[in-house]
Amino acid sequence: MAVSEIKPKLKLNPLTKVPISHNKRDRDLPGSLQCQLQHKEKKLSASQMAAFQDAYNFFYKDKTGCIDFHGLMCTVAKLGMNLTKHDVYNELKCADIDRDGKVNFSDFIKVLTDKNLFLKAVVPEKETCLDLAGNPGILLFEILSRLLETSALPRKSIIEIVSYFQRKFQHTGPGMLWSPYTMGYGKRTLKPDICTPPSSSMAAFANAARIAIMKEKDLFKFLEELKRCNSGSDSPYSKIPIFPLFPNVDGVVMGKPFKDMQKLEMLRIKEPLHFFEDYFFHKRDWKTQAANIKSMDPASGYSNNIFTIDQMLKKKQTCTVADATAIKQHVKRATDTYNLGIALEHRKEMLNLWQKIRGDLIGMDSRNESFYDTFSTYTWSWNVCQELLSPKDLRLYDAYVNRNSSHNSRSSSSSDTSECYTDSGRKRKRKGLKGFQQ
């Protein structure tokens, strides 16, 4: 057979698919990320657009209503962010999508809804905080974070923006931030260090959302690492105070009508004194513990624990390890006794302040009882690591004061009536004597 006859038979067909070995970038990319890159970004709702409009209105703008270089510099200075003119110019250039030298509302929305810029702000490549040179294009995210942290926007707008970015972070998938090939396609590896603080304020919001999408195994690792970093300490500042993680959305809603107040009061009376939050947060009954404290020794003028420590130190000139351990226990009890005493005094001051500002009338006038929760949070004390007055304590105190005031008013009215009767009797006697004398 001739060679010319064989050549047409050896002709290769054109490739219809790219071999897997040639597509290295797609092979290194996680499967979840491949799906998300194909996912089309949803349009913002009307409430979300209004929330971002409130954030846009915070910026200084020129006569045309756009953010120019001078307006961005003034906004940065107003928020207390120290940036050079060169950094602000580069950020303005990155945010200027239509290249007209200014940032209008359309550019503002496109930057804040861009997935790549959002991930760059959440997981910056540089470890330094607000490194605009290494992470260009994140200034608007940092400004927005400052506005959320300082509550410079309306409450409804804050809730809309935070909810939007939480959903956006969750849609990126848990493998995106935990994969070693994230944002670099194999060129960059993330080494998450839980002990270090977040490198940006936007990352703090993302870390809160990341816990919600963690698997159980990853969550246990996170807690173990957190326990390892936070070693046990007697310092009150090493303890984490209990505050609501999310704002009370129903705090601005008007209360029930006045006709339901009696029914509400009956429910309060039947309500148990120990809330399930006390059990959930392991709050101790420090008032009962303070009531069981032994009084001071009248001879020494100090508490029994301090007097015991003094006697132990006087008896022994040199202390062993066992003696130091025993003394440490007495010192801890004496410190707890002192903290409980200070907490009781501070609790009395808070009750006097509550009575002085008439806190019970504030809720009645506005028909909204959220002021009880607000004042209870204000009474937080590091001496007992919880609130000195719970909303239940304030309501019971109001009921006690109102009961005593009504009792005193009844007794005063009865005494006034008896005095009135005695005065009228005296007047009649005087008139009778005058008539008899005449």
Curated annotation (Swiss-Prot):
Q: Where is the composition biased (Basic residues)?
A: 426-438
Query: Do you know which Pfam families this protein is assigned to?
Result: EF-hand_8
Biased composition of type Low complexity is found at 405-415
UniProt region (Disordered), positions on chain: 405-438
Sorted UniProt keywords: Calcium, Metal-binding, Phosphoprotein, Repeat
Organism superkingdom:
Eukaryota
List modified residues, type Phosphotyrosine.
279
What is a GO molecular function of this protein? calcium ion binding
The EF-hand domain is annotated at 47-82, 83-118
Binding site residues for Ca(2+): 96, 98, 100, 102, 107
Q: What is this protein called?
A: EF-hand calcium-binding domain-containing protein 3
- As recorded in Swiss-Prot or TrEMBL, the protein's gene is named EFCAB3
